[in-house]
């Protein structure tokens, strides 16, 4: 109830054990709700060590003027290459590339996952207009916007970075400051989306 009062987007809240688990659950939830499998990541974001999040773009060898997507490569060995086709990546704060990617892949995306302040990349921050554009494009293409606030939640502001940016995501993940050392994390979001966690819907739990 306290989280819901502080974060307007947190209409319903569920708990997990770690930030990684929260993001895994958020992505699974988005796929279950939309019926789509692909997803969009912002290059440089860290969302935990699970297979779906362990991809990066080879931007150094990529020509942004081409019609081709940047090459997607895994963080390391042990990640099934069959998952590669589901992950799409865009550079942070490149509004044109974001729009182009949605035009090309938007109707197959379940979610866009963004860490607005990238904790593992020297705190590179998303511009407000970039995140607001992401919100608009997600609405236009029926894609769920997931804001990863595992590190920023209740640290940068009472309502998280989303409150500062003035953007309301469909799903949010919190950890770190939520537990202050205890193993706890949060998946929160729109009520209609969150109710997809149900028997016969998306699975959620843990030990």
Residue ranges and their predicted role:
Residues 1-207:
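Conserved N-terminal phosphate-binding loop of PLP-dependent enzymes in the Aspartate aminotransferase
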């Amino acid at each position: 109830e306290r989280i819901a009062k502080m974060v307007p987007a947190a209409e319903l809240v569920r708990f997990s054990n770690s930030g990684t688990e929260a993001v895994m659950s958020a992505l699974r939830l988005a796929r279950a709700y939309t019926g789509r499998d692909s997803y969009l990541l912002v290059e440089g974001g860290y969302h935990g060590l699970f297979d779906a999040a362990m991809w990066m773009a080879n931007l150094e060898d990529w020509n942004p003027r081409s019609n081709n997507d940047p090459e997607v490569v895994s963080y390391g060995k042990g990640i099934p290459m069959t998952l590669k086709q589901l992950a799409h990546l865009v550079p942070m704060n490149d509004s044109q590339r974001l729009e182009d990617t949605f035009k090309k892949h938007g109707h197959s995306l379940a979610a866009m996952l963004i860490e607005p302040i990238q904790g593992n990349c020297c705190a590179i921050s998303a511009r407000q207009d970039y995140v607001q554009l992401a919100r608009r494009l997600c609405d236009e293409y029926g894609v769920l916007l997931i804001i990863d606030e595992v590190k920023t939640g209740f640290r940068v502001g009472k309502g998280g970075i989303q409150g500062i940016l003035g953007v309301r995501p469909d799903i949010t993940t919190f950890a770190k400051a939520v537990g202050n050392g205890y193993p706890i994390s949060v998946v929160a979001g729109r009520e209609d989306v969150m109710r997809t966690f149900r028997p016969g819907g998306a699975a959620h739990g843990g030990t």
